[in-house]
Curated annotation (Swiss-Prot):
Alphabetical list of SUPFAM superfamilies matching this protein: alpha/beta knot
Subunit structure: Homodimer.
Cellular component annotations (GO), alphabetically ordered: cytosol
Tree of life domain: Bacteria
Residues the record lists as binding S-adenosyl-L-methionine: 108, 127-132
This protein's name: tRNA (guanine-N(1)-)-methyltransferase
One GO molecular-function entry: tRNA (guanine(37)-N1)-methyltransferase activity
Recorded catalytic activity of this chain's protein: guanosine(37) in tRNA + S-adenosyl-L-methionine = N(1)-methylguanosine(37) in tRNA + S-adenosyl-L-homocysteine + H(+)
Gene: trmD
A Pfam short name: tRNA_m1G_MT
Biological process, per Gene Ontology: tRNA N1-guanine methylation
EC number annotated for this UniProt entry: 2.1.1.228
């Protein structure tokens, strides 16, 4: 995968040289290029200006972005504009992006964008219902979530498939050594070696956690018959005061 990032602050992306994203680059699975669009700005390198019609703040000018895009060698890239007014970013969107060969992220700054910039864009995406100083942190988050889904980036291909949200549910609790730490013991079922009991326990815990913490996810979740039976049992137990 090839990723191009348009930003005023390329140095902010240093964390992408480490961890999973850095390893993907080392394996030759990922190529990232940073483009400071101030380098393409006319008018004394100014990238912003006052909005027509008045108003507070400054807008990112179209010219530096257009000229930077013209300089990028890309065939049919997915062009993502980081914008708090965009569609919310979700795991399913990361899975979709992981299938692309070329991605371009446009990181804004200031009050907003000249509307004409959006003619270059295929997707307007928001990290959430809040406003950041710039799009860099949002872009890094989306890139990390996407790159880890590229085949062969993670050690085990199945490891991301059980992550929270990948299945549509939150992930079940997990434990490692020691068995007993400060009086907190690993659930007996995980020590039993009985694979079917462990599978059912994990399913129940995943459904329960999702119901308690993110019930909105269950509104569109496609329950199997087995999950529906377990979920009904969970709701019944909770209504009777079960913890």
């Amino acid at each position: 995968m090839k990723i191009d990032i348009l930003t005023l602050f390329p140095e902010m992306f240093a964390p992408l040289e480490h961890s999973i994203v850095g390893k993907a680059k080392e394996k030759g699975l990922l190529d990232i290029h940073y483009h400071n669009f101030r380098d393409h700005a006319e008018k004394a390198r100014h990238v912003d200006d006052e909005p027509y019609g008045g108003g507070q703040g400054m807008l990112l000018r179209a010219q530096p972005i257009f000229d930077t895009m013209d300089s990028i060698q890309a065939t049919k890239p997915r062009v993502i504009l980081l914008d708090p007014a965009g569609k919310p970013f979700h795991q399913s969107y990361a899975e979709e992006l992981a299938l692309e060969e070329e991605l371009i992220f446009i990181c804004g700054h200031y009050e907003g964008y000249d509307e004409r910039i959006k003619t270059l864009v295929t997707d307007e995406i928001s990290l959430g219902d809040f406003v950041l100083t710039g799009g860099e942190l949002a872009a890094m988050t989306m890139i990390d979530a996407t790159v880890r889904l590229i085949p062969n980036v993670l050690g085990k291909q199945a490891s991301h498939q059980e992550d929270s949200f990948s299945s549509g549910l939150l992930e079940y609790p997990q434990y490692t050594r020691p068995y007993d730490y400060r009086g907190m013991k690993v659930p007996d079922v995980l020590m039993s070696g009985h694979h079917e009991h462990i599978r059912l326990w994990r399913m129940e815990q995943s459904l329960k956690k999702t119901y308690l913490r993110r019930p909105d996810l269950l509104e569109t979740y496609d329950f199997s018959d087995e999950e529906k039976r377990i979920f009904d049992k969970i709701k019944s137990g909770l209504s009777e005061g079960e913890n």
